[in-house]
Amino acid sequence: LNAFVTEVIANSSFTEIDRIYLANRVMSLVGEEAAKQETAATSLIDLKDDLLEVALAVGKIGSTLAEQDILGAELMNLVTPAPGQLNQQFWQTYEQDPKRAIADFYELSKRNDYIKVKAISKNIAYQTPTEYGDLEITINLSKPEKDPKEIAAAKKAKTSHYPACQLCFENEGYQGRLDHPARANHRIIRFDLAGREWGFQYSPYAYFNEHCIFLDSKHTPMAISRATFERLLDIVETFPGYFAGSNADLPIVGGSILT
């Protein structure tokens, strides 16, 4: 517990004066037994994982991945600036150095475990020769499928239409539930795109380096039009160093055969 609080202070705007407050907030989430536990972990994310084990052992959470993710996101929210503060910091830095502002946001998203760096490292990637040139094959092991218990529990859960989808702005800071991912430590950078408010966020389970998402602040059906290409060009001007593409405007893109 003390080691986790030390890392929170080192990676946030909290100061040493906040130590007792932080310890009490963490104990309220994982149980007071955490204060007695010894650990060899040193990194913020490993310390968070140790606290999740304590919470599981004392019955603060169940064994489902969803419950662990909800608590984990709540713990890592302690090192995540509030949306208003983060956006102010981002655009202040952007005025001096746009690439630095983007890099800082990316580092925060890794440091607070929104981008699942530890899980992504489990992915397998290799090159294989083809008649068209070398093809990169990736096996995604980082994004876990739901286990049968979670699927059964989700079916029994009361239907909710909030947030409207897993990408929209309503996810920022959302606690999460069995059938919707935890987003307490999730943040979105706001920016103007052709007179409308849009958002810039990273993908938690990246399929490629610095995999990010640009989205309209309003939940609207996907549509490909001339405006789509105008937006793409504006995006790459606003966010130097990145390239942008668009999803297809199909009713369903992706999904799981388990549900």
Residue ranges with predicted function:
Residues D192, I235-V236, D249-L250:
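A short acidic-Thr-Gly-centered motif at the start of a beta-strand
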